[in-house]
Regions:
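C-terminal helical subdomain
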Residues: 172-175, 180, 184-222
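Structural signature of the Rossmann-like NAD(P)-dependent dehydrogenase/reductase core
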Residues: 8-9, 78-79, 123-129, 169-174
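Catalytic loop of short-chain dehydrogenase/reductase
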Residues: 82-100, 108, 120-164
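N-terminal Rossmann NAD(P)H-binding glycine-rich loop of SDR-like oxidoreductase domains
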Residues: 12-22
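Conserved glycine-rich Rossmann-like NAD(P)H-binding loop of the short-chain dehydrogenase/reductase
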Residues: 26-41
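A short hydrophobic alpha-helix cap/turn motif
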Residues: 24, 118-119, 161-165, 178
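Rossmann-fold cofactor-recognition segment
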Residues: 45-59
């Protein structure tokens, strides 16, 4: 397999860290973006670590193209996200707004900044959640998280349509219920989740661009 340049946001822990690990093991070059690095990420020795990268801070990500020099990205993975549990009683407007900024607007800003650094035939990956599916909402609550992920899905579909003439495909993937800090340790292993995600990334093309898939290959409803 030809060595690829892969840029991953939120790569210091959880799914982002495991994506970094597995792509490096395949011989790819990985550019790791995070607000603060971790000993685990440093131990993996990615191609570059860009620390101090806050997807909400335009100034912190504005110079990414120049920092990448002439490197062109094959795969951009928007993984950074936040979940703040809520219900009607605990609903906090600021928390809802924060989740919209991080989960929906943040990835869009990253794409805008890095558009000139993408190869002509590149892949944009958005790690979303089936909790952003309106049709699949069987339990309610999590207002801010659900709404922010639904917004991310809408953004990703628009990008799929806007960027298809350039040969850029867009993957909208649910990683499954994964045992991470965000899920309280409940769910499948991070390794299993990422193995499935990589299969979805490898099979992504312009024909299935803009569709919503579970890491196990199941197409999910909007």
């Amino acid at each position: 397999m030809t060595q690829r340049n892969i840029l991953i946001t939120g790569s210091n822990r959880g799914i982002g860290l495991e994506l970094t690990k597995q792509f490096l093991s395949q011989g790819d070059q990985v550019f790791a973006l995070c607000r603060k690095s971790s000993s685990e990420l440093i131990h993996l020795k990615p191609t570059r670590i860009f620390e101090g990268m806050d997807v909400l801070n335009s100034n912190s990500i504005r110079d990414l193209p120049s920092k990448l020099l002439d490197t062109k990205i094959d795969i951009l993975i928007n993984n950074a996200g936040i979940l703040i549990p809520d219900n009607l009683q605990s609903l906090d407007e600021e928390n809802v707004f924060t989740q919209f900024l991080v989960n929906a607007l943040g990835p869009l800003k990253v794409v805008k900044v890095l558009l000139s650094s993408l190869k002509k035939i590149a892949k944009l990956i958005f790690l979303t959640s089936r909790m952003g599916s309106i049709a699949d909402n069987n339990s309610g609550s999590y207002y801010g998280y659900r709404a922010s992920k639904a917004a991310l899905n809408a953004i990703a579909v628009s990008l799929a349509k806007d960027l298809s003439p350039r040969g850029i495909s867009v993957g909208i993937f649910h990683p499954g219920m994964v045992a991470t800090r965000m899920s309280g340790g409940q769910g499948i292993s991070i390794t299993e989740s990422v193995e499935g995600l990589i299969k979805r990334i490898e099979s992504l093309n312009l024909h299935n661009s803009g569709k919503f898939f579970h890491q196990n290959g199941e197409e999910l409803p909007w």
